[in-house]
Amino acid sequence: MKKVFVKTYGCQMNEYDSDKMVDVLNASQGLEPTDNVEEADVILFNTCSVREKAQEKVFSELGRMKALKAVKPDLVIGVGGCVASQEGASIVSRAPYVDVVFGPQTLHRLPDLIARRQRTGQSQVDISFPEIEKFDHLPPARVEGPSAFVSIMEGCSKYCSYCVVPYTRGEEVSRPFEDVLAEVAGLAEQGVREVTLLGQNVNAYRGKMGDTTEIADFALLIEYVAEIPGIERIRYTTSHPKEFTSRLVELYGRCDKLVNHLHLPVQHASDRILMAMKRGYSVLEYKSIIRKLRVLRPDMSMSSDFIVGFPGETDADFEKLMAMIEEIGYDTSFSFIFSPRPGTPAANLHDDTPHEVKLRRLQRLQATIEENVQRISQNMVGTVQRILVEGPARKDPTELHGRTENNRVVNFALPGVPQAGRDRLVGQLVDVSITQAFPHSLRGEIVVRQ
């Protein structure tokens, strides 16, 4: 049986796309996924171009594939994702042993690209933007476990000054309303209990409703997803503060299936820097969203993205960022030093801050976030948390593990519960009393209701 190996870089959108690559090749050619690159007949790299480091990792990996290709001349090597969109045919120029190059919007054409490569002997490149076409050509999702990603829109139309996503994934295009609901319903029938709705700016969703001229916004989509039998939890990422409507805020007051956690990237806490980033909101407007949410959900868990060392960032700007991190009490983050991307306006900005200064700022920020994480975890000890059971614990298969609403992994014992009873709990929501907090997980015991 032929096999496909996929290496994924970057965001959850790429994770979703990688799963779809496997689904497409399985449906068309019977390929099964493998974690062993050496036994693969097709090797795909689903790439990210948000930071230079991630991009260079791809070419480093490709270099290692050259020797494997020499031993297995029929091996197919493909590069997809945002680096593929950005670099196109230059990838083949730099690595002639690459067989196919495809963008996020053309992954459904993989079988045809591979067949054309094998027929002509020429490397194939397709990085076009055929809007939402790919979703019409994808086979039904195959899922394992109680959680799944669902892409509801593609692209970005915000054009932040530092970001390449609009150039690599195209403008915002929303999937039709009924198509999203049908995919979620299909997942629920396979046992999925938690869905994460995905988009570069997921709350900018505007989906066409059937044959009418009506458009569904993101809040309406969530309301309908919440009504699908079997779906117990709803997450989404990544949201944009500029698109966080009052309708979406109000939904947190009446939709229990929306988890008590939100990833809302702020990037910075200096209005001057936010303006240079072209983010489209002020610090006050961002804080206002969180204040309104915490009126409805006082213990709402927040996470964010942060960029330090943006051109022109002063010590005073950075202190504003640190103050906001303390004020809001973020629970985890994705934080990075500014990485100038070719073709973006920010790449041309004057930057006179030494790298050592940027590195110290990043280390301080990450240390503060880690302190927040540990404090929040410790405060969960003694509480009862609702856990979605994902399967056996990795270190002790006699126990189970699952996740809290704020994404903490919880390993828990089941005293007196036979193995058959444990197996039946996978995919269920259970109450667990938290007894211990560790750096990256929690421990507890299931609460047995009499």
Swiss-Prot record:
Residues 378-448 form the TRAM domain. The keyword Nucleotidyltransferase does not apply. GO terms for cellular component: cytosol. Coiled coil: none annotated. Its main location: cytoplasm. SMART domains: Elp3 (SM00729). InterPro entries: Elp3/MiaA/NifB-like_rSAM, Methylthiotransferase, Methylthiotransferase_CS, Methylthiotransferase_N, Methylthiotransferase_N_sf, MiaB_methiolase, rSAM, rSAM_horseshoe. [4Fe-4S] cluster 2 binds at C156, C160, C163. Residues 142-375 form the Radical SAM core domain. Binds 2 [4Fe-4S] clusters. One cluster is coordinated with 3 cysteines and an exchangeable S-adenosyl-L-methionine. [4Fe-4S] cluster 1 binds at C11, C48, C82. Its cofactor is [4Fe-4S] cluster. GO terms for molecular function: 4 iron, 4 sulfur cluster binding; metal ion binding; N6-isopentenyladenosine methylthiotransferase activity. It is found in: Cytoplasm. Keywords: 4Fe-4S, Cytoplasm, Iron, Iron-sulfur, Metal-binding, S-adenosyl-L-methionine, Transferase, tRNA processing. Monomer. NCBIfam families: miaB-methiolase, MiaB/RimO family radical SAM methylthiotransferase. PANTHER family: CDK5 REGULATORY SUBUNIT-ASSOCIATED PROTEIN 1, MITOCHONDRIAL TRNA METHYLTHIOTRANSFERASE CDK5RAP1. HAMAP family: tRNA_metthiotr_MiaB. Catalyzes the methylthiolation of N6-(dimethylallyl)adenosine (i(6)A), leading to the formation of 2-methylthio-N6-(dimethylallyl)adenosine (ms(2)i(6)A) at position 37 in tRNAs that read codons beginning with uridine. Belongs to the methylthiotransferase family. MiaB subfamily. This is tRNA-2-methylthio-N(6)-dimethylallyladenosine synthase. The gene is miaB.
